[in-house]
């Protein structure tokens, strides 16, 4: 068996998505098609009720189905359009279950710097001096899903002889010093 210990919830989720995929195949074309249909329907519904020239952050935050809470300086972190796209993707993710839900959450997380008004090449997130324009959240998500699935497929084809099945991989979200493991149960630490 393999045990991973991550103190960060996001790191723990990334570890689970990267290590527990073998018994949960994802049909990339179906997933992208389903996300696209949902996204386009919600996008059109929103713009049928709001003028494209005058949408603001509050309109997006008040949108039925939005799960993103208001937070300080939201208008500096997102354009209204990028916030709407992110809101729709989050709504879609919340409709999913299990591995697919975690997979999509990691895909969105990987693209947040490209979606928000931040410079992508800096270690610490800072506002961009000029807001990012024409952010296509759906396109970014589709490319990230394809990239992640390619990585999974490459791993399956090149490393299948060393992969463990999902039930023998455990990711513990905790501090390694506070995790109770049986004596002599660890043979390697990475």
List where the protein language model places each region.
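Conserved SAM-binding motif I beta-strand of class I
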Residues: 2-6
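SAM-dependent nucleic-acid methyltransferase catalytic core
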Residues: 79-190
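Conserved phosphoryl-transfer catalytic core
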Residues: 10-89
